[in-house]
Amino acid sequence: MIDDKAKEIQAMFQKALGHCELTDNLMGVRYTKLSDNSCFSGLATALGCLVGDILDNRKAMECIAYNGRECATIIKAKGITPVECFGLCPTEDRVCFETKEELDQVIAYWTKVYTPFRAQKASMIQDLEKGRKCEINFINGKFVEEARKLGIETPFNDMIVKCVTEIQNGEYTLEEAWEKNLDRFEIPSL
């Protein structure tokens, strides 16, 4: 519920930052952000690369599209309505596809959303570079956990969790990840 106190706090943030939105759909915001992190932070970490490297590679972008579709399917199955954040809103009409033409449209959507962040290094990569455990189990792993409860298959989220866990466990380095992992993702035929 958005009450007068929340509106008062919003006004302070707007004055200080120039922009602040209120919502009572916290799960929608949470799952939009989780989807965002699952796609580009998860895959970037699994591949040991920057966002721009993904944007420049067709197969990596197909992985993003399939991973995003998994996230949107889970979000819908949970009855959650995503909220647009930073241009991203993981609804079925934006990130789901059945044909190659629709896949191309979804890739164009993700490309538009993420082009401003080409130089971004995922926070999970930064954690691993510092020798810290990353939050893979709370991002992609959260989608995997929810999917199991719902009977939904998540081969792309599963593979991202597997790859990042292997890197985290020292089985190979971030520098080796692109060459080792991109081909492990199986792109279905459309």
Which residues are covered by each model-predicted region?
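Internal alpha-helical scaffold of NAD(P)-dependent oxidoreductase catalytic cores
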Residues: 1-88
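NAD(P)-dependent Rossmann-like dehydrogenase/reductase catalytic/cofactor-binding core
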Residues: 14, 62-190
